Amino acid sequence: MNGFWQPSCSLDALSARAELLRTLREFFAAREVLEVQTATLASHTVTDINIESLRVQDSSFLQTSPEYQLKRLLAAGAPSIYQLGPVFRAGEAGRLHNPEFTLLEWYRLGFDDVMLMAEVAELVDLVLGPQPVRLLPYRELVGTLTGDRDVLDLACADALARLGPGRFFVTEYPAQQAALARLNSANPEVAARFELVIDGVEIANGYHELGDAAELRRRFQDDCAERVSTGHFCPELDERFLAAMEAGLPDCAGVALGVDRLLMLKMGASSLAEVMPFPVGVA
């Protein structure tokens, strides 16, 4: 048991993390994007079938993302905003997963998904050094836009793992995988959604945000129906969030980026445990 109390990562990794957080904040300060803090413990959570939340005393949830609360701030008149801090997801542990991790999420007023991809690429170039990013439509990656969602998810994950070195924006996700993104106005078969993959690691997920409250409610209800049919817990819909969307979400694009994974790539590490002091096994 000797040394069982020791942190998982090196002191160099702690210094690199501090430097990265400083770099991220300077990036947004230079663009006059406001840093905000929202609640990590809230009364509601996401319905996404692929995400499991951590419940606290059966009545509250540790947040899987600040998305709903950030969008409520935007509906209340906030300018372009970002949040940098911890989020939580149940059942996620491994080389690239931890139940608690650091997420950078930001929203840019007046941006669409294409404009936001350019800004994401700027940030990544700043952190990792300049390198071209290839645009890769989902149909080109997977070979189809139609079929069972679970089958498509597996095919996509397998294709991403085989991409190899390099930076890729996967774009034009099928409409059934739109999540909270708008559908593409020129081609409603696909969503205005993108994911950034670097050296086979998924780093960021972004949308041209959907603000239609009725459509969002329908998507949430579809999620819940799928959850019930597969034996998963179905949370109550977040009516405060939906009321904010009814009041009006300004035209914007948003993206969530995994800071720990970005740091892992920057340091040439092979797992999150090398860049987190206390991952789940030693926390």
Q: What are the residue ranges of the model-derived segments?
A:
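A translation/RNA-centric and nucleic-acid-associated enzymatic feature enriched
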Residues: 4, 23, 39-73, 82-109, ...
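Hydrophobic face of alpha-helices
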Residues: 21, 25, 117-124, 217, ...
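A conserved active-site cap/scaffold subdomain adjacent to cofactor or substrate pockets
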Residues: 96-147
